[in-house]
Amino acid sequence: MTVTTSAPSGGGEAAVPPEDLVTLTIDGAELSVPKGTLVIRAAEQLGIEIPRFCDHPLLDPAGACRQCIVEVEGQRKPMASCTITCTDGMVVKTHLTSPVAEKAQHGVMELLLINHPLDCPVCDKGGECPLQNQAMSHGNAESRFEGRKRTYEKPVPISTQVLLDRERCVLCARCTRFSNQVAGDPMIELVERGALQQVGTGEGDPFESYFSGNTIQICPVGALTSAAYRFRSRPFDLVSSPSVCEHCSGGCATRTDHRRGKVMRRLAADDPEVNEEWMCDKGRFAFRYAQLKDRLDVPLVRNAEGVLEAASWPEALEAAARGLTAARSRAGVLTGGRLTVEDAYAYSKFARVALDTNDIDFRARVHSGEEADFLASRVAGRGRDLDGTGVTYTSLEKAPAVLLVGFESEEEAPGVFLRLRKAWRKHKQRVYALATHATRGLEKAGGTLLPAAPGTETEWLDALASGVGLEDSGTAAAQALRAEGAVIVVGERLAAVAGGLTAAVRASAATGARLVWIPRRAGERGAVEVGALPSLLPGGRPATDPRAREEVAAVWGLAELPARYGRDTHQIIEAAATGELSALVVAGVEPADLPDPARAREALDSVGFLVSLELRPSEVTERADVVLPVAAVAEKPGTFLNWEGRVRFFDAALKPEQMTRRLAPTDTRVLHMLADAMDVHLGLPDLRTTRAEIDRLGAWDGPRASEPAESANALPRPAAGEAVLAGHRLLLDQGVLQEGDEALAGTRHAAHARLSSATAAEAGVADGEILTVTGPRGTVGLPLRITDMPDRVVWLPLNSVGGGVASDTGATPGSLVRIGPAARAEEALEEVEA
């Protein structure tokens, strides 16, 4: 038999030319593979499974466990198939045809089991353990070992969520290689030598990596286990359901394991085109928010005494319908960025059909009219599964150069960070970032900082476009962006910079680099597509275009749609606070997420009628007139559209028949029932109908919205004792979807303020001391970390423990704040109160 293989499928790569192929024989079967292919991979292509522990297709070869030994003709001894590459004319015999290879593998297995404990009945890995399986298939029937097994103290917590059992470890180095190579976090290593060798961490240096959970999943023997899952269940007790992560716009494929109606754990699924086999710890561990005891399970209605009390669904829907009908054309809808495509579409339709308004916006964050124009002209209707264009994970990894603007990959889209780091390791991709300082994520991706104070991004982008007025690193970046395949990545934070997105479009046109927008939340890309914006209808249709409105009205069975350009989130909040709007429908939005939380709370207190669709009690439900519980991601089917424009469908992991409690309906179902109660036909009773209607509308084929055309604002000029505020959210912060997992919370990065050395000296604060930052509404104090960054700029994590910047200070990035030592904090606070 002769087999010829070319490039791996799924990547869209051309076939390997014949001169780049080598031909070898494995167990009598001849095959041709690309040069550089490992023998163990070539055997897999023939369906031959060579036992292994250390080998992993996404890690560099190590040859640590020696379990994959094969016989190679012409070699003096058996060789590890995971480390040798195929050569022309090579003849390989595996354990299936070679007594030498079989004996060697049996011997290695016998040695591995000498000190391995008999923990299988209680080990979390039992039932899905490669060592257990291969001991049965490739081990001796009896052990010759009669001594006492080596023991260690166990388990050893190497972080709050990863526990180490050294007795079980076979020193495969999968965990250490992943941490070093893939995540760039060399926080665990193999220490000691010989018989004393073991996995360890530095003294007082815990394993605080955003990707530590991957080491648990790829450990082949249960030496690394999850603190939250340990001894909770056995693999054969679990039902596994494919799903998609709901935490960021990456769209990572996951596997949800559940038992008796309760999610027990979540694992990374294998998707070579998206997350490969990895996921961040937030996606892996942050699912318990839906299982907390305060979960809403019945509707609530505010009674005549002003107290929320439980109500039946008909009662709650009638109360909500009565209030919203009275406010028709004077109501706003805030949806947040976490909704599925179908749910976001339902809100978009509900706003126009039931409330007769375009006052709807998903952007519970800093936003602008310039961003709305950018999304309408450059994002809507474009992407991998929309029009077949756009940047993907694969093209981002292959790009010769990438510029990040208003985007921190490790904190805001960890899957993107892993691809950037992989690209730097494999082919020295050049990564540049317009930011205040070099973040850990940028350093781990081999990136170069282009130091930019808040507001100067527009000037930087124009300079990169023209190639004029740049210093060495800027000149190199401008040249790199002109290489074929280069990419400019803009994040949602660039919306805070006047002219920033306009300049990004100009830079893309001038350099030829492809432009891609990567938001932070999972539902934002889909919300753009279904018209959860004041300026857009579904399919990228401009809300002010008569033909666009006619198309949508025809599908929705209406005579006409509202023609007025709607209010954005900021304007909706202002209108609610001043009484211009008399009702709000709020879904999954926290005031703390908004640029001005205090004003948002005033609006919620002032608005005449408030309906909240939520999972758990929040600041919004506390103020709501009607609270309607909705389903969590694990409890419903749906679709996310990731930043690539790739459709990510998932089914419900938890089904009604598995539950001991009644599952809440989806947002779409609730809005359908609410519209019925308002005597309005929404026509979205289920997912299938909703999906079909979205497909029927399709993409807009008319003229697109105009490109953004915003100019830069005058930059603030801080005096002594002042600074321009900069900041972004950390991956693990005080977000409500992270609640319920104390082990995960224990790995949050400590919150610090950052200043340049000159600014710190001017402010009278030394490294490690408390720096106070005072805005228009209050003060926050954090330990100072002196950093190489522009002068008179202060960087703060925006929503970390000890530093809810917008809530505590009333300041937003780009604004002026006062800075000083802790001793001046009370004085500054008194001035604010005065």
What do these predicted regions represent?
Residues L196, R232-V239, G336-L339, H367, ...:
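A glycine-rich phosphate-binding loop feature that marks nucleotide/adenosyl-phosphate handling sites
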Residues V487-Q571, A577:
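A glycine-rich, hydrophobic/aromatic-adjacent loop/helix-cap motif
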Residues T2, V33, I50, D55, ...:
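A cross-kingdom feature strongest in bacterial/archaeal respiratory oxidoreductases
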Residues T2-V16, L21-L38, E44, R52, ...:
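N-terminal export/assembly segments and adjacent metallocofactor-ligating motifs
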Residues T436-H437, E443-S473, G500-R506, E635, ...:
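Short alpha-helices
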Residues D356-G369, H427-H437, G512-G526, V607-V620:
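A generic structural motif
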Residues R260-E277, K282-L292, D297-V301, S312, ...:
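Long hydrophobic segments that form regular secondary structure
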Residues L449-P454, L533-D545, V627-P637:
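Acidic, Ser/Thr-rich peripheral helices and adjacent loops at domain boundaries
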